[in-house]
Amino acid sequence: MRHRPSAKGTVRLVGRLEFSAVTEGAPRITDEYRIQVDIANPLDRALPQVFEVGGRIPREGGYHVNPDGSLCLGSMLRQRLILGAQPSLVDYVDKCVVPFLYGHSLRESGTTAFPFGELAHGVAGLIDDYCLIFGVSDEDGLRRLMWLLAMKRRRANKLRCICGCGRRFAACKLHRKAHAARRTLSRLDIKRACQEIWPSN
């Protein structure tokens, strides 16, 4: 891939991405796409934007393309968890971009579509995915849990758990699942995710 001129402060890489991928229940596919990767911040602060620029993927929501033309590679927190605490651009491409493109190639071939699962569009999809990540069942529980996780840990641990068990957050089993995610996710990640879903809060 080559570096191309871009907006001030953004690193833009454009070129062909070749890959060979396979998953259980679907065939191996070797393919290539022309993509553009815009990196505005270090990976530990913000995820890159990725665009398919060869004209193969329609710029429509049904193909998991955002209104600005970038590929919807999954929720922000899910991508963060996939990448781990020390993300690299190579990991980002291998673990987030290639699975998306592999899914599209399967769709083109008529075999199947997005074997790794699909989120609903917009806020509804984010809520569904974050409920799975944190082990809560509805939006209200998610909002209250993410509010706790956005606090300093010492303060949040002393408050009552949002599940209604009557225990302090630190003593509840919900705490263990939530803080397993927090080993990778920062408070800034949580706050940004909250703003995506509830921008007025």
Predicted regions and their residues:
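Acidic/negatively charged segments and metal-coordination signatures
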Residues: 24, 77-201
